[in-house]
């Protein structure tokens, strides 16, 4: 009898090191369930990268770990690579796979925008509800960076699969009454108790519908370069950014860029009679 680990390897959302999200962290935090996660998270984030390796190696020395299956995903949330690793290879190969994952994960191909609108966040999308390596909204900017720089972020809803856990909503400035009505505190708060990132659970400004939420964010961007041509990006979630919506103010940035294909003529956002997009 023994343990075979199975996990995807990807950049972590709140620390950087040789082992980030993957098999080593799964042993340190995942297999330890709530207690394991809590015992690591309640120590300084500055040494998180060291703890993950320490805990992982200790578990391999004391538990019958037979090996692991590592998966890397591509930018379209599909499988890019599957690799079987012996316990020794978890130590030597996982850091190399992590480096590959940095190249294969999705990125919004812009440095910055005024407003980022995210239709839905959820634990099935990212541990933080939305992946900061895409959204640029890191739990601990002191230890991590990347993604797009948006002056304001709007989150419109949570996924059905997250069962009311709205962790990550606190990373936005504006949200909707719909999201807050669907948020279950008893599903959301235990995550914060475990990981200590209590600001992930904060409630942003609540607007009655999607239109008002987006309008508020657009009104409140003092750093915008051109207030008549605001730069806004709308994505369904951070895992699916192959097709995105951009405002006309961003058209000059994509017109001559071979990485973009313009799929439609400009159109108005399709708000329904209640001011919502869905």
Task: Please tell me what each predicted stretch does.
Residues 1-122:
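Conserved, well-structured core segments that form the ligand-binding/active-site neighborhood
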Residues 114-118, 122-126, 200-205:
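Active-site rim loops that border cofactor/substrate pockets in soluble metabolic enzymes
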Residues 131-278:
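C-terminal non-catalytic interaction/assembly regions of soluble proteins
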Residues 14-19, 79-84, 127-131, 166-168, ...:
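Short acidic, glycine/serine/threonine-rich loops at helix termini
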